[in-house]
Amino acid sequence: PLSGQVYYIQYNVCQEDPALPMEDFAAQVQADLEAGGYSRVLVDLRNNGGGSDGVIWPLLSVLRQEMDDGTEVVGLIGEATFSSAIINAVELQEMGIPLVGEPASGSVDHFGSVSGFSLPNSGIQIGVSSKYIDLGTLLEAGLGAQVEPLVPTVLVEQTLDGYLAGRDTLVDWLLANG
C-alpha cells in the first residue's frame, strides 16, 4: 500500500514467476484488497517491456471484481511501456480504467509474438516477430490508434527535479489527486 487507501501493483514483465505464478499473485492481491478496505488500486506498467500478454488475465479478473464493488483502478504507463505491456494497458482501457502518465514507447498496433532460432554457424540466438497485432480489430479501446503510440488518458510527466530528488512525480500526483 502507498497510503491507507491506495494499493499499488508494480507489473514489470509479462511473464510468469515460477516462485509466484500469476494465479497465486492475483489471489494474494484479492485477499489484500478484501482485508484492507482500499478505495483505489494503481497498476504500474511503466517499466514493463512486454512478454506474454495473457499472463495478466487472472489479475484483470480480480480488478474487474474490485471495480464492480466500487474500487477505483488506475493504470500507469510511460516511455518504457512496450509490446505486450501495451496490449495489457489497452485491456485496462477496455475495462474502463483510465491510463495516467506519459506516452508508451511502442504503438498500439505492432509486430509481436517473438519466435527464436540459432544461426547455424555462429550459434547466435535471433528473435523475430512472427505476427502483426492489430488491437483495433480486437479491442474497442484500440480502435483508430493504429501505429500511433499509446497515450495516457491524463498526461503527467516525470520531472527532472522530481527524478533528482528521488520522487515519483506520477505517483505523487495520483496521491494528491485521489
What is the predicted role of each segment?
Residues 1-178:
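C-terminal "post-core" interaction segments
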